[in-house]
Amino acid sequence: HSFPTRRSSDLTNHPLNKGMLGMHGNLGPNINTNKCDVLIAVGMRFDDRVTGKLETYAKQAKIIHFDIDPAEIDKNVKTDVAVLGDCKETLAAVTQLLEPANHQEWIDSFRQYEEVEEEKVIRPELHPAGKALSMGEVVRAVSEATHNEAILVTDVGQNQMMSARYFKYSKERSIVTSGGLGTMGFGLPAAIGATFGRPDRTVCVFMGDGGLQMNLQELGTIMEQKAPVKMILLNNNFLGNVRQWQAMFFNRRYSFTPMMNPDYMKIASAYDIPARRVMTREELAKAIDEMIATDGPFLLEACVEEEGNVMPMTPPGGSVNQMLLEC
């Protein structure tokens, strides 16, 4: 059971949830995609960020594809069984025909990958040895401070991947993201909308310095509407996702990715929005508590490691079982 973008409710804690598929997803689900005998895809478009090299993707598996749009069937990956319709109806109908089964050996096969990923990626990200804040530890700290009950909104880039990996949920309908569409600037207006749609819940949006500046004027909307958006800026002074590719595949030839940033504290003040900048983990918890306790909008600028990377990563053109754990 793996989920590229549908991650809400108690799915993050369910014992059969083995993590996230995709280029920056979890190690086990990606590797075992090329080992499973049956692959059930629900509302999935089999985009290249999930499949990696198509010629080697799940060739051993019988693929069952649930979707409401017939154009998605066989578009990228050949389907053995197609089930068309609203998934609320089709899944309910199919599950009535199933008998309980226990595939413990298959479930246990994920453990070795979980242990490797924990050691090589997750622990260093959430508990870094260096002085600089990591993106992952900021995301997890906000998640825990909101008791995993907040609505998560993401922009695009490394902030999106880190949010998907380390933010947890205890309620349904808890994530708003543009998936693989690459819509930098999406986060801020989407978060404003979420506060109107669910005024009873805390809305946290994670953004990078590149994405925030693409829709910075929406701070005016927040000021005017008094939208209680909790904005977390992961500021690394780079267009981080592109910089990571330039570092890994182009010998660190950084072209148009270093950012010259304004003073976000002064900008927030100009919009009459409370704000705080943190540069050390000793400051982080107190600043997050202040953000959550503030009645209204708040901008938390976390100055994170400038050249942090999102791992694991399936290299461009590589197979899903060739994930890299380090640069």
Question: Residue locations for each model-derived region?
Answer:
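Short, small-residue-biased leader/transition segments that mark boundaries at the very start
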Residues: 1-8
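Alpha-helix C-terminal capping/helix-to-coil transition sites in glycosyltransferase folds
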Residues: 3, 34-35, 78
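Short internal beta-strands
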Residues: 6, 64-67, 231-234
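Thiamine diphosphate
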Residues: 17, 21-23, 30, 74-84, ...
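Phosphate/diphosphate-binding loops
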Residues: 22-73, 259
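Structural motif
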Residues: 38, 151, 202-204
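Flexible, glycine/charged-enriched surface loops at secondary-structure junctions
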Residues: 100-114, 299
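Active-site diphosphate/adenylate-binding microenvironment
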Residues: 114-189
